[in-house]
């Protein structure tokens, strides 16, 4: 009787464990609150993606994430990849501070207190390389040519240090550089056969890549800083296509000056124009990042809007700086020859190009409604009128937060339409830019009081009719603060806006 009871108990336990055991989809563990702790206990290294089924970024990531999972599994790695539907598992999402989709966190040895945020690229190689850096040595020891070949073949970019004495000062500097780079595999070797295969007869560092010239040999004194600079200059293609997968490399890189070629892949002289762009890029490695954008692709239409371009105006070139202040520049010539692009880049670096400020034409009825319409051409005259207090919403037509605000802003306009010195206005910041105001987020609300000193006050109070009225009646004091909402860098990323009914969570990279 006892043995039968024990058997039933054991079977019940097995059934319960089986019910909670994570399922797999394309080699990715599917986790829920009921099996999350079990998965952490079973796997020392676990990368978890918190996603939403409707999220465009998550859909784009899915095949690369699965490819990375399959690659690690095939290698017999301890590392596993998992995913959590955060819209279903809200408790887990809240526990791990999920604010946007996808959010990806790395759990090591079951530590739930401080999982590492995944910040590298969205391609399978990026994911695998980042994980291997987190779980193994900074550089793999390459004992023979087969090991070197495997490392080079494993990724789009790989770096190998050739040192006859791997304990030398130069080798130590190389390892420090390897520790500082997340998304590129590093190898180190003292094997004479490996030296011979890659045509080295003395110590050196080589960056191998599956594009452009194929390899770059480091020259000069081997220091961590110089190696990192060398890698920065050579790890990306001369021209990189802007996609969902490459966006993190573009925005996450150290080069903050980007020149963009908007070119439809369907155009007859596509190869020639891209070739001219690539030829110009050769002279600006490490200084300006050359980016190609397929202007026909649906996901890229918002980027065209951001630069004030229409599909029929492409091919076209624009330059942007992503420092503290985002600034755009337009070539004086529409010619897309290598010579003209090179000249434009040189003139920019020499400080001889003025920023390009977009403006729509002024509508005839711009001041006929309670909310006045501002464009670049009339902004200065209206906003800095010394006799008027002007409250302006800087918006983007596609922004969900702006759409929510619209009816409230219209009511505010109605409230003050007959006021003698308060003006409520709005400006589409995707089509209009002004030198006096840098818009970093949507919507941005700024107050221009009736003074002669061109004062500008940020509003960051409640976005309610009462909140706005208190702010205006207090002379711009009650609710003043820094602007904070959808970052403009997101506007440059493809497929940023999801359906309106998904407005509860910001879609972040």
Swiss-Prot record:
Domain Thioredoxin: 20-136, 335-477
Listed SUPFAM superfamilies: Thioredoxin-like
Position of sequence motif Prevents secretion from ER: 506-509
Xref: CDD domains: PDI_a_family, PDI_a_PDI_a'_C, PDI_b'_family, PDI_b_family
Record-linked PROSITE patterns: ER_TARGET, THIOREDOXIN_1, THIOREDOXIN_2
Enzyme Commission number, as recorded: 5.3.4.1
GO-annotated biological processes: protein folding; response to endoplasmic reticulum stress
TM stretches of this protein: none
Pfam family for this entry, one: Thioredoxin
Domain of life: Eukaryota
Region (Disordered): 473-509
Membrane topology qualifier: Peripheral membrane protein
Post-translational modification comment from the UniProt entry: Phosphorylation of Ser-359 by FAM20C is induced by endoplasmic reticulum stress and results in a functional switch from oxidoreductase to molecular chaperone. It also promotes interaction with ERN1.
Signal sequence region: 1-19
Site positions for Contributes to redox potential value: 56-57, 400-401
Catalytic site: 55 (nucleophile), 58 (nucleophile), 399 (nucleophile), 402 (nucleophile)
Main enzyme class: isomerase
Protein localization: Endoplasmic reticulum; Endoplasmic reticulum lumen; Melanosome; Cell membrane
N6-acetyllysine sites (modified residues): 202
GO terms of molecular function: protein disulfide isomerase activity; protein heterodimerization activity
UniProt KW keywords: Acetylation, Cell membrane, Chaperone, Disulfide bond, Endoplasmic reticulum, Isomerase, Membrane, Phosphoprotein, Redox-active center, Repeat, Signal
Ranges of compositional bias, category Acidic residues: 480-501
Sequence positions bearing N6-succinyllysine: 224, 273
Family: Belongs to the protein disulfide isomerase family.
Oligomeric form and interacting partners: Heterodimer; heterodimerizes with the protein microsomal triglyceride transfer MTTP. Homodimer. Homodimer. Monomers and homotetramers may also occur. Interacts with P4HA2, forming a heterotetramer consisting of 2 alpha subunits (P4HA2) and 2 beta (P4HB), where P4HB plays the role of a structural subunit; this tetramer catalyzes the formation of 4-hydroxyproline in collagen. Also constitutes the structural subunit of the microsomal triacylglycerol transfer protein MTTP in mammalian cells. Stabilizes both enzymes and retain them in the ER without contributing to the catalytic activity.
Name used for this protein in its record: Protein disulfide-isomerase
Species, as recorded: Cricetulus griseus
């Amino acid at each position: 009787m006892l043995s039968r009871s024990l058997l039933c108990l054991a079977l019940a336990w097995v059934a319960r464990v089986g019910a909670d055991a994570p399922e797999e989809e394309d080699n990715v563990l599917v986790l829920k609150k009921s099996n999350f702790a079990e998965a952490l206990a079973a796997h020392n290294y676990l990368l978890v993606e918190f996603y939403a089924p409707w999220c465009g970024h998550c859909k784009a990531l899915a095949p690369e994430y699965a490819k990375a999972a399959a690659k690690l599994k095939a290698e017999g790695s301890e590392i596993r990849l998992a995913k959590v539907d955060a819209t279903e598992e809200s408790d887990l999402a809240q526990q791990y501070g999920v604010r946007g989709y996808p959010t990806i966190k790395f759990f090591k040895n079951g530590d739930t207190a401080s999982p590492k945020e995944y910040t590298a690229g969205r391609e399978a190689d990026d994911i695998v390389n980042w994980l291997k850096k987190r779980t193994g040595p900074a550089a793999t020891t390459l004992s023979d040519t087969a090991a070197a070949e495997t490392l080079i073949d494993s990724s789009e970019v790989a770096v190998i240090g050739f040192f006859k004495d791997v304990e030398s000062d130069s080798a130590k500097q190389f390892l420090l550089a390897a520790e500082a780079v997340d998304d590129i595999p590093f190898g180190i070797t003292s094997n004479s056969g490996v030296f011979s295969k890659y045509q080295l007869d003395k110590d050196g560092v080589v960056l191998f890549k599956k594009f452009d010239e194929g390899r770059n040999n480091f020259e000069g004194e081997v220091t961590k800083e110089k190696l990192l600079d060398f890698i920065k200059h050579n790890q990306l293609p001369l021209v990189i296509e802007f996609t969902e997968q490459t966006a993190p490399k573009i925005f996450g890189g150290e080069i903050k000056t980007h020149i963009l070629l908007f070119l439809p892949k369907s155009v007859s002289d596509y190869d020639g124009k891209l070739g001219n762009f690539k030829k110009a890029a050769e002279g600006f490695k490490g200084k300006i990042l050359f980016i190609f954008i397929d202007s026909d692709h649906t996901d890229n239409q918002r980027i065209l809007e951001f630069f004030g371009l229409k599909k029929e105006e492409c091919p076209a070139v624009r330059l942007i700086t992503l420092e503290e202040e985002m600034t755009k520049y337009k070539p004086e010539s529409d010619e897309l020859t290598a010579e003209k692009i090179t000249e434009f880049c040189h003139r920019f670096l020499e400080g001889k190009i003025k920023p390009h400020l977009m403006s729509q034409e002024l509508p005839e009825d711009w001041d006929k409604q309670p909310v006045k319409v501002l464009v670049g051409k009339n902004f200065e005259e209206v906003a800095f009128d010394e006799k008027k207090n002007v409250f302006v919403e800087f918006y983007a037509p596609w922004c969900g937060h702006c759409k929510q605000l619209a009816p409230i802003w219209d009511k505010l306009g109605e409230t003050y339409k007959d006021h003698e010195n308060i003006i409520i206005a709005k400006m589409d910041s995707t089509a209009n830019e002004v030198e006096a105001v840098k818009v970093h987020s949507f919507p941005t609300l700024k107050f221009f009081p009736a003074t002669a000193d061109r004062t500008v006050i940020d509003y960051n109070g409640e976005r309610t009719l009462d909140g706005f009225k208190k702010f205006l009646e207090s002379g711009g004091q009650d609710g003043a603060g820094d602007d904070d909402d959808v970052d403009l860098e997101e506007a440059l990323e493809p497929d940023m806006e999801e359906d309106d009914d998904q407005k509860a969570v910001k879609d972040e990279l």
